[in-house]
């Protein structure tokens, strides 16, 4: 296996013997003074077909979190009845790192979709619960059980849909509303969002969950009043933007967004804008 790009000391982008691009992980495989050829014994894990947008996560996420997420992705592939995308380990790692950050910041958020996920996707929810239990053991933090729904959603959203399948009317509407919501964020937060970036893909995935929840029959959850109040006061522009995005969603789909959902949406908007915010723009 030949190295074509060293990502960090323990990760490299390679070409295998069949000419396919692959990400190789292993202790020291990306060391600058190392060899350009890797032996199988040097490699602990490989990933084929991963979108290049996800590669920066290898430098941003704790290797222990990434390894845990990779194991969870392996378990999911063996248990669900549908094909999962090549990026799953990376999207799970990003989501789990965000959970850990929120727990460490004492920001416990009720997942707005938890009830629906638990009953509509029992296997994925079970995987989420097992992941929460293991995270408590591995990372020594009190992860709330409600986070199981978010992990389940990360698995569900990774489902591979045949490219030959024509877009339904609802899918086209989702695309239109997603574009509208993105333009609202760009205008109100005064940023330019790269629609080819991983950060945008993460934001778009969250909006898709909201579209499904609002257009369905499930009632929104309430709670987290203290956190909602804190977000309004500390990030007034972000929360106001979330409210406008929420109005765009409910105008298109009906229903309403609970304050819990606005809070979670605010966190995603803030996260999306962190790296691209214009100089001098406060949130």
What are these regions (language model features)?
Residues 1-283:
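A cross-family "folded-core" feature that marks the main globular domain of proteins
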């Amino acid at each position: 296996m030949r190295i074509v790009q060293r990502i960090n000391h323990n990760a490299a982008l390679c070409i295998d013997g069949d000419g396919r691009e692959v990400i190789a992980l292993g202790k020291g495989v990306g060391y600058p003074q190392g060899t350009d050829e890797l032996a199988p014994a040097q490699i602990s894990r490989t990933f084929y077909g991963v979108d290049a947008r996800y590669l920066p996560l290898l430098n941003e996420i704790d290797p222990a979190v990434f390894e845990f997420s990779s194991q969870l992705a392996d378990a999911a592939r063996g248990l669900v009845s549908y094909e999962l995308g090549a990026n799953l380990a990376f999207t799970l790692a990003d989501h789990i790192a965000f959970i850990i950050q929120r727990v460490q910041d004492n920001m416990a958020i009720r997942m707005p979709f938890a009830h629906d996920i638990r009953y509509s996707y029992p296997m994925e929810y079970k995987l989420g619960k097992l992941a929460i239990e293991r995270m408590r053991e591995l990372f020594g933090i009190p992860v709330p059980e409600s986070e199981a729904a978010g992990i389940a959603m990360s698995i569900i959203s990774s489902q591979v849909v045949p490219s030959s399948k024509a877009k339904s009317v609802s899918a086209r509407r989702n695309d239109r509303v997603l574009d509208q919501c993105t333009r609202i964020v760009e205008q109100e937060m005064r940023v330019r969002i790269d629609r080819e970036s991983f950060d945008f893909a993460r934001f778009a995935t969250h909006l898709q969950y909201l579209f499904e929840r609002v257009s369905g029959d499930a009632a929104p959850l309430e709670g987290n009043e203290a956190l909602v109040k804190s977000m309004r006061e500390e990030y007034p522009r972000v929360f106001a933007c979330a409210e406008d995005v929420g109005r765009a969603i409910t105008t298109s789909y009906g229903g309403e967004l609970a304050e819990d959902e606005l809070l979670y949406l605010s966190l995603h908007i803030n996260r999306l804008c962190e790296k691209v915010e214009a100089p001098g723009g406060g949130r």
